């Protein structure tokens, strides 16, 4: 079984395929703490991380920023006291690509 967090993102162009319904069902099982949201017709992955204070939430946000730069794939991040909401989707295809699931798994690893 492939471990998503061990995979690397690939360049995603505007003509890249979105995940199929079958792929979505398989991939979402690999990141059980994430939910699929649809905003403005665009499918996205979202998770809320809880922290004891703002400083810890900000430290996590900074780690996530470094990861996003390394993989050249960038999430929506909303940081507030004790909480960080992370949203992954592929802007170029206006939906979900395998990269988003890889990055969700890598984001989860930042907690460890």
From Swiss-Prot:
Keyword vocabulary terms for this entry: Lyase
Give the matching NCBIfam families: PRK00823.1-1 (NF002016)
GO BP terms: tetrahydrobiopterin biosynthetic process
Q: List the disulfide bonds.
A: none
EC class of this enzyme? Answer: lyase
Q: Which domain of life is it from?
A: Bacteria
Catalysed conversion reaction: (4aS,6R)-4a-hydroxy-L-erythro-5,6,7,8-tetrahydrobiopterin = (6R)-L-erythro-6,7-dihydrobiopterin + H2O
TM spans, by residue?
Answer: none
Give the EC number(s) under which this enzyme is classified. 4.2.1.96
Q: Which family does it belong to?
A: Belongs to the pterin-4-alpha-carbinolamine dehydratase family.
One Pfam family, please name it: Pterin_4a
The name under which this protein is listed is: Putative pterin-4-alpha-carbinolamine dehydratase
Q: Which SUPFAM superfamilies does the record match to this protein?
A: PCD-like
Q: Which InterPro entries does the protein's record reference?
A: PCD_sf, Pterin-4-alpha-carb_dehyd, Pterin_deHydtase
| GO molecular function (one) | 4-alpha-hydroxytetrahydrobiopterin dehydratase activity
């Amino acid at each position: 079984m492939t471990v998503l967090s061990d995979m690397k993102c690939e360049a995603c162009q505007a003509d890249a395929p979105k995940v199929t319904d079958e792929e979505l069902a398989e991939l979402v099982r690999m990141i059980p703490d994430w939910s699929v949201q649809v905003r403005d017709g665009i499918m996205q992955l979202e998770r809320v991380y809880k922290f004891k204070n703002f400083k810890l939430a900000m430290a996590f946000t900074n780690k996530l920023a470094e990861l996003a730069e390394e993989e050249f794939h960038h999430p929506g991040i909303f940081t507030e006291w004790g909480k960080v909401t992370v949203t992954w989707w592929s802007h170029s295809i206006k939906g979900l690509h395998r990269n988003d699931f890889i990055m969700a798994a890598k984001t989860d690893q930042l907690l460890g």
